[in-house]
């Protein structure tokens, strides 16, 4: 059955339900590589800590996310899911989860209009019920309810879209308010909290909290050590070059590769490219990160210096217009340009509208400038590792998603301990718990601390072992 043609009766929207069996086989493989999630299922399945939780999920609909969804359901939650990126869905994963009865709204290559339609659908629960928790990646689900509720009171907030994505979002909100003037505030009032996956979404949350605009409590999953120092670093170290090579078949060795941004994501990208014997150059605004890059042997330059010389460009900053039209105009013919930050505006793709676009294959485009020079743009400036490959490996996502699951349990079952409008991180003992759950899979054995040793360094025998301010 093709779900796209069956929407009148089906509470889901995926590309092709005939892919479900394939997706299920890959889910089975992923489970063997996700020990954290499987251990959490075993620990909490009987107690059902998420019973009564209705989770609106906005996160890349991949095989690994399928294991997360089924973990949440195994712990008692009801879930509705959409992808947080128009290119990141794995259609067989979406079909496999939809086949279990969990509503999924995600298609690889969906339009922006469909993207925001699907994000609305995760808040449209049957029988007059509403979501009471959000699991977010990038903050779009959180943004949607807050912006829509503001628009109910002041329509002028939708008057001046600053991008094509905002134009589509604002139009979707206006259409929804025309049908139900209280659609957003009704749903916003029911949310007990959000757990946020990624750096960009966390920045949004802190901005909202600082302005007094955040309507519920939030847990910043990204800054758990077992997320940011593993997913962001080790995940990108493997998935970046996977995406670039699947898209272009380029030989990386000997090329000059520029990594814009040397945070955890940038560090992983630089390591990956250097391991393939690229000459790695780094651009940075932060003197500490710049010094780290220089001490690793990377050349620290400006984008203006790098543009005419490099062969591969990767943005990993979380900022916007890091690579501009002027930079791309200065690049060599056939330079490869891609982004591994959450949003598509790190590269100023909108400034290329007057260029000729030639699709080489899905998510790989030649952009031809008026002088005939071409660059190769990957995933139209969106996440290259998910647009051109399948994202991070299952094992490292087990660590991230174990944090997400624990954060959902924490925020749902102990909601009174978290103040509305504030952003929290998981306590250190839970961070260490996530790490413990993954050691056996790698054959790692911890040394046990004796009581006299614990007394000597003034820590509990069972941890936590580091103060909150410790930098891993």
Swiss-Prot record:
- InterPro entries registered for this protein in UniProt: Adenosylhomocyst_ase-like_sf, Adenosylhomocysteinase-like, Ado_hCys_hydrolase_NAD-bd, NAD(P)-bd_dom_sf, S-Ado-L-homoCys_hydrolase_CS
Q: Which GO terms describe its biological process?
A: L-homocysteine biosynthetic process; one-carbon metabolic process; S-adenosylmethionine cycle
Q: Which residues are substrate-binding?
A: 62, 137, 197, 227, 231
- Bilayer-crossing regions: none
Question: What does the record give as the reaction this protein catalyses?
Answer: S-adenosyl-L-homocysteine + H2O = L-homocysteine + adenosine
Where along this sequence does the record place binding of NAD(+)?
Answer: 198-200, 232, 261-266, 284, 319, 340-342, 385
Listed A to Z, the keywords are: Cytoplasm, Hydrolase, NAD, One-carbon metabolism
Record's cofactor remark: Binds 1 NAD(+) per subunit.
Per the entry, what this protein does is:
May play a key role in the regulation of the intracellular concentration of adenosylhomocysteine.
Q: Output this protein's name.
A: Adenosylhomocysteinase
For this protein's source organism, the top of the classification is: Bacteria, Pseudomonadati, Pseudomonadota, Betaproteobacteria, Burkholderiales
What gene name does this entry carry? ahcY
